[in-house]
Amino acid sequence: MDDVEVPAFQRARRPEQRELRRQEILDAAELLLADLPAEEISLRELGRQLNVSKTHVVRYFETREGVFLELLNRQRLAWLDALSEELPEPPCEPEQAMAAWAGSLAARQVLCQLWSLLPNVLERNVSAETVLVYKLIDLEHRTRLATLIRDRVPALTEDDALTLTEYAVVSLVGLWPFSCPTPAIAEATADPRLERARVDFPVMYGEILKTTLAGLLARS
């Protein structure tokens, strides 16, 4: 059955209208991701959330993955704004900063889900131009993150601080799915013999950040 188009979501004619429509689509995606895994959300489902057709959504985003990439940028920026307040004030122990970083991310499940899907889902089925725009914004955001960390760990060089953010993203991509087990995996790992198979994301991610930071500091 075709989706019904409604006048409330008319085609944007001016740049500010177009941006408003894009933000409305991102808002809808964010709401859906609070209840559904990303793989269950299609452009058609986004259209239903807004009471418009899939065609309307495609006018503003080329693919579902394009929507998620843009939402990842928006979520990451909001996190960085909050992180500047959530990290301990300098001077502080490096391990405190890493633990706060991990805890702050763990509290933002939609952001973690999107970030973990980056290489295998979000960067597929999009144009080279979309990927270029995303990666330039990602670099800008990680540079800002590196600055926040260097403010608290001044012994870290500028280059190593950016390297830390690169390793942090790769670690999140690998670790987050293990911290969201299916019911069958959760039941199996409830066995006391498999205690070490259970992943507590903020704890393990914090340890990864601390270990990586220690290695970078040791080599500098």
Locations of regions flagged by a protein language model:
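C-terminal peripheral helix-coil segments that are non-catalytic and often amphipathic
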Residues: M1-F9, T143-A155, S171-S220
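Basic, helix-initiating cap at the start of DNA-binding domains
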Residues: M1-P37, R44, R48
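Amphipathic alpha-helical segments used for helix-helix packing
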Residues: R108-L132, C180-E187
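Amphipathic alpha-helical interaction segments
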Residues: E24, E45, Q96-A100, T163-V170, ...
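Hydrophobic alpha-helical connector segments
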Residues: E70, S84-L114, L164-A168
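Alpha-helical structural segments
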Residues: L20, E24-L31, D35, Q49, ...
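Helix-turn-helix
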Residues: L32, E39-G66, E70
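Amphipathic alpha-helical packing segments from all-alpha helical-bundle domains
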Residues: N125-V153, D159-L162, G206
